[in-house]
Amino acid sequence: MKLTHFPERIIWFQSLFIYPIYLSGTLFLFNLLQVWILAGYAIFWQIKLSVGPEDQINSTDIRHWRSIPPLIWAWLISMVGMGVTILIGLYENDYNSNEFIRSTISWLGDWSLLGIYPILGYLLPIRPAIIYRSACVIAAQSLIAMPICYGAYLMKLPGLIYLSPLERIIQNGKSYYLINWYSREVDSDGIRFVLFTPWGPALGLIGCIFFFYALEEKKLGWKWLGILGSLAMLVTSVSRGAYLFLPATIAIVWAIRNLSFIQLQLSLGTSFFLGGLGSTLLLDRFQEASGGVKSARKSSSQLRAKLEQAAFDRWTDSPFYGHGKQIPGPDFLKNMPIGSHHTWIGLLFTQGMIGFCLFFIPLVWSLIDLSLKAKSSPIAHITLKALLLITFASFSDNIEKLSYLYWSVFLLIGVTYRQPLHVEEEFLLGK
């Protein structure tokens, strides 16, 4: 594939060498540098366009910042506001300057990416095909990595290879710097792969996203390697959530694309009516299914429930700006941080109602707008699927911690708005 612009070369380099970068313990740092290199490139061109001749704007593929749509601005403003909210929460809870520095560094590596990448996707000439092919390349490499990781398990090698010394320098959490062959399941003592991600559910989420990317690949060979690799990532992650997210996303987006607004209303109305008639039976079946899923990893489900309850109970101590950061839990929570394992309850605990709204508003706005565009835009269609997956995952994980892995989704949000799309009024009119 011909790489026509510098930003595409940066993305392609990361996909080609993701496993060497991971094994060196620098994947988080590399992805952090990637966004700031691209941001610097975008700023350079914005200055050049501002001081250069008027016709230069039309002679380059770089978009001018004045044309950035409101939704893209909303992501940036909200994520900057998130950083300010974190600092206010730390100040109100009397944390020292070291915590201010650590939290600022953490913000630069998680929440800030959700605000920067949509703008980069809009301003810079990055083709979606590069993102799709890159996902297929990573998935193909993962097909090679999995037998090696399983061989390490058969040879009874320890799951942990080493902890990168970068953790002592950046200090934003050990999980980003643990280099693993595999990880152990708590309940069954079985194994699950994490590959280049920090934990199993993260691999499951990335596998789901890459699956949708692979379906868009034009070259048949890369397409099938991407599909097989992404599904293998999903299966070997042993993530209960990911097993449900994929079919749910397919069903929801199919309904959005293929049913008119009136048809959706009729379908939902009929479903609710029939559901009401058989509500007792349906509730019993749902509870049985839910209990089966939770019992598959009972101790994990119980721990998550306790963490969520503890975070929700403590939220009222600082309802508006939160506690500023996650705090270590007591022994009965196995010292897991309060505010972890659930994005929304975690937001209430760490950033309060202000932080909750700062993420909720641009996310819901994006989902609605992409749903309207998905009928007429293939890029909006794939972006909607990927963003829905992240939304589902937010109810079982702190998804901001994984933004350095799924950054391509937010890049695609910006790419979607580069093109002159028109919302199909027929959808709203039911035609």
Residues covered by each model-derived region:
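Long extracytoplasmic/lumenal interhelical loops at the membrane interface
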Residues: 282-351, 370-375
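Loop-to-helix entry and N-terminal half of a specific, functionally important transmembrane alpha helix
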Residues: 7-20, 369-397, 406-416
